[in-house]
């Protein structure tokens, strides 16, 4: 999901760079909301959401993203309760706005979130400050999960994108595997016979299948 989110962010920024660069300094400043300190998925999403976005930016001749708070070596703000919560993300953004805003010339120009719940909290904070509402500047906010709330926020123009599990790919994997097992093949053999680019066999377990994520920016 982190890889998919990062590429989606990079592609969006390349297409909309000047609009996102609020202070016109040529670099996009970002905040990162991490769901949990130790969760491996949170770690990977935090890492690759930025790394893969930077890869796209670099390929397009653009500078890498700059974390908004140079005094924070972690380059993220984490839900200390490990709950991936909207409340934690909103609290962080409310606090960030005190020192980082348009008047000060150092506004956060992009927010990357480990999940859609945290994205909701960020958007609530932005909207209280007059952003991400009809007729106002939209700070791009990206999440993961493609929840119904996130889809509604995207439809309203308040959220830019999220990442969803490929439901069609999941259904195809189940159908093809079930058919192969019904023909007498062992599960590992059945999975190995799949020929869809949406599927990846786990390197450490021949009977484990990964189904690709897909970007979501609206219906």
Regions found by a protein language model. Name each.
Residues 1-219:
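A residue-level marker of the well-folded mature domains of exported/periplasmic proteins
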């Amino acid at each position: 999901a982190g890889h998919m989110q990062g590429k989606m962010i990079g592609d969006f920024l390349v297409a909309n760079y000047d609009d996102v660069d609020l202070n016109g300094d040529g670099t996009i400043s970002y905040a990162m909301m991490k769901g949990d300190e130790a969760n491996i998925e949170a770690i990977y999403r935090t890492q690759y959401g930025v790394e893969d976005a930077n890869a796209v930016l670099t390929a397009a001749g653009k500078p890498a993203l700059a974390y908004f708070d140079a005094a924070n070596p972690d380059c993220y703000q984490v839900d200390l309760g490990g709950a991936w919560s909207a409340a934690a993300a909103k609290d962080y953004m409310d606090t960030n706005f005190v020192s980082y805003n348009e008047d000060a010339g150092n506004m956060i120009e992009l927010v990357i979130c480990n999940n859609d719940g945290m994205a909701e909290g960020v958007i609530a904070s932005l909207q209280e400050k007059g952003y991400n509402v009809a007729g106002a500047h939209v700070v791009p906010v990206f999440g993961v999960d493609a929840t119904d709330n996130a889809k509604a926020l995207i439809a309203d123009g308040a959220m830019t994108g999220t990442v969803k599990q490929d439901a069609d790919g999941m259904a195809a994997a189940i159908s093809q595997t079930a058919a192969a097992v019904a023909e007498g093949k062992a599960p590992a053999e059945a999975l190995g016979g799949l020929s869809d680019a949406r599927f990846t066999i786990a390197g450490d377990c021949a009977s484990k299948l990964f189904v690709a994520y897909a970007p979501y920016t609206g219906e």
